[in-house]
Amino acid sequence: MKSTVAAVKNPTGKVQADVCKPFTGKLFYLDLTSKLISEKLEKDIKELGGAIEGFLSKEISYLITSKKEAKCVKTLKYVCSIPSPEAAPNTGESSTSPGNRRLCQEGNSSKKNEKSLVSRGKSLVKRAIKEQEILPKNSILSNALNWGVKILHVEEAKHYIEKKKTALQQVRKSQPVVKVESKPQTRRKVKPQKLKSPYIKVEDCSCQYRPLYLVLPQFRSFQNPVSNYSVEVDKKADPGQKLPETKQSVNKTGHGQDGANNPNIKLKEQKKHGYCECCLKKYDDLESHILSPQHKNFSESAYYQVVDDLISTFDFDFVDWSKYKNGRKGVGILMLAEKSKTEGQERNEANLFVSKTHNFSERVTATTPLQENTLKDQHASPCSLPCTPACNADQMFSLPSPAGSARLCNKKYKMDSNFGQLVATPLPSFNLKDSLTGSFGGREMFVAKLNETMEPATEGPKIKWDVCNIPSNISQCIPQKVDPIAQHVNQFPNGNTHCSEMTACQAALIYENVDSAADANIKLPKTVNDLHNKEGHRATDKIYPTVQSHEYLPDYSPSGNLHRKVKTSAHRNKNKDELFCRLSHKVSVPQQEDDSKFPSETLLALFESSEDKTEFFGFAGSPAYESCSMDDGDTPDQTHKKMLLSLFPHTTTSGSSFLGF
């Protein structure tokens, strides 16, 4: 007793430790179904110095269980101390029957007979003994009893723990209070880190707070309102998006930030990384790679020579058609040039004058090539007629022309000051008989632009049509009637007939080597007023868009045929004196001979429109020219008729308006 008290008074002794931790060195195994009770007991046992084991073994000191069998621990110990009836088969003896001992002495033969002589009652007794066993085999309780582990019910364990806790509290109250002096906290050692300049560092003098630092890619200038960052701000960055957390605590506190810049804006280098398929290499910056010599050498090399060769073979140049949106302005007789078969030969002094019709009411004339010796032919002396003042001398409409025709543009005709007349210039010749089989063969027609500085034409007798230089053969075929206009024509001694000065709407229709035998009267067709009613069966030739420009296009534009269409317009009042050219080689009704009409009025019927209020929209005709071919059996009347029709190119009838080339 004295030793116990002395041990309690001595705070530094081992007995004092046993009082504070009564479960020190004890192992507990909890066999509980309630989780809450198990956690509470585990906490109390650890406070008292005990330990919890997760597996049942012979080292366990106490087994705490919630089973009912744990309440009668003494009875369980008594039952377990009785030898098991199953031990008899192992020893070869039966503990229930004394007669079996006698049989054991008799030998093995008697043992076999005993096993076979077991009665039914004995087997029932054995079964009853097994059923009376309280603890099943290999259970937690049976194993704990066999290993000598102390078994406690959960209620008994709670009462025992509470008892130990109260005893511990009494011991703590009896002990004097000992004040423990708090030692100053030792400064935490931090591994030094080297900062890369430029940087900003804020350090506490007392060293109680860790320093704040910020490493900058480029030191900021306080004089400029805008930061001199080498990295541009990403405009797509969300202003509310926060910067990722880093070791730099200044991002959290906001110290050291420039007030002019938003710290929430994400900085991003504006560099586009990618792969160049031409150079077969990766690049970090697109702009610098494009300017690199390797990329330039590839773009300037001969890799694209095949593409350039293909583009150079195209017939058309790339023209921006959006500049020419006004498609309502008409054009006169536009004859496209056919490409020459023999390249390199210069085509000299061959012109096709085209007048730009103002509100579709200007006069239109055409010119064809003339052989050099045509003017010297006595049978080909043409008559000259002055042009009507209704014609306009506006700038000509320019069209693509073959190679060599650019030299013929903007050419002035030499005017005779004494007579005020234009001298016809010899032009390249062509064989009319060889070219009447459907086309003009190798003829070349060019579009020339009249010079704006051309002198005005001398006034003469006015007439409603502009055709001059009519072949003498046609004038011979027409009934001979004195024409007052022909009296104003001046002939030179050499027999050449000259027209008065030409304007933009005047041209000459010239023939070569007309057969002198064709002296008979030709039946001229009647005014054509129903040509477009028979357009359904005719094929449509390719029409090229009109380029309304005063500049000349490249001279490799294709050749083609035109068509004209007349459309009635109720919104415009046309002057009846203004004529509309409607050319067609197919005339429905031939005109009867009338001696009372002048030759000019007879030819005027070819170009006269069927309606007064019409708009000029292009030519209309048949592509077939087989009927125009000259046969040996044709009469002179038919021969001259075919020659007249062959002057005009192949035309087609189309429902669409004339758009140009």
Swiss-Prot record:
Residue ranges occupied by any BRCT domain in the UniProt entry: 18-111, 136-161
Keyword terms: Cell cycle, Metal-binding, Nucleus, Phosphoprotein, Repeat, Zinc, Zinc-finger
Region called Disordered, residue ranges: 86-119, 234-266
GO biological process: positive regulation of nuclear cell cycle DNA replication; regulation of cell cycle phase transition
GO molecular-function terms, A-Z: nucleic acid binding; protein serine/threonine kinase activator activity; zinc ion binding
Sequence positions that bind Zn(2+): C276, C279, H289, H295
CC terms in the record's Gene Ontology section: Dbf4-dependent protein kinase complex
Composition bias type Polar residues, residue spans: 246-264
Superkingdom of the organism of origin: Eukaryota
PTMs per UniProt: Phosphorylated.
Zn finger spans (DBF4-type): 269-317
Subcellular localization, as worded in the UniProt entry: Nucleus
Quaternary structure, from the entry: Forms a complex with cdc7.
Function, as annotated: Regulatory subunit for cdc7 which activates its kinase activity thereby playing a central role in DNA replication and cell proliferation. Not required during the initiation of DNA replication in egg and during early embryonic development but is required later and throughout development. The complex cdc7-dbf4a phosphorylates mcm2 subunit.
Protein name per the record: Protein DBF4 homolog A
Lineage: Eukaryota, Metazoa, Chordata, Craniata, Vertebrata
